[in-house]
């Protein structure tokens, strides 16, 4: 990414708490990292791939945002509620929720 562009945008999400679903890989992971570059105070990432989730969490923390990884299956309503509950307890009110997760019935 162009660092000059990122530095101009650094405070766009300053002090905001963001949840990004489907963020253990691909566009979800990149979206979560972009929020960190844009100054988000804290980001909750979630998905079913725990190893990848922990790796993305470390990358986000290196950028400068706090991060929580929650292993979750978004086809399970209790998991969805748990994501928001854990985020609220850890960081406070959720300001933005971005759904990148998809579901395909097999």
Question: Residue spans of the language-model regions?
Answer:
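Flexible N-terminal pre-Rossmann segment of NAD(P)-dependent oxidoreductases
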Residues: 1-19
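Conserved glycine-rich cofactor-binding loop
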Residues: 17, 24-26, 49
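Aromatic pocket-lining residues of Rossmann-like dinucleotide-binding sites
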Residues: 35
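Conserved glycine-rich Rossmann-like NAD(P)H-binding loop of the short-chain dehydrogenase/reductase
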Residues: 40-56
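The beta1-alpha1 cofactor-binding region of Rossmann-like NAD(H)/NADP(H)-dependent oxidoreductases
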Residues: 72-83
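Conserved catalytic-site loops of classical short-chain dehydrogenases/reductases
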Residues: 95-96
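Conserved NAD(P)H cofactor-binding loop of Rossmann-fold oxidoreductase domains
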Residues: 100-105
């Amino acid at each position: 990414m162009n660092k000059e562009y990122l530095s101009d945008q650094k405070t766009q999400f300053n002090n905001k708490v963001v949840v990004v679903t489907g963020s253990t890989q691909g566009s979800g992971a990149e979206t979560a990292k972009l929020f960190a570059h844009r100054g988000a105070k804290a980001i909750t990432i979630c998905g079913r791939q725990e190893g990848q989730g922990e790796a993305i969490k470390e990358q986000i923390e290196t950028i400068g945002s706090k991060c929580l990884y929650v292993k979750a299956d978004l086809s399970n309503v209790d998991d969805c509620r748990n994501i928001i509950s854990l985020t609220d307890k850890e960081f406070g009110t959720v300001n933005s929720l971005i759904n990148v997760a998809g579901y395909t019935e097999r």
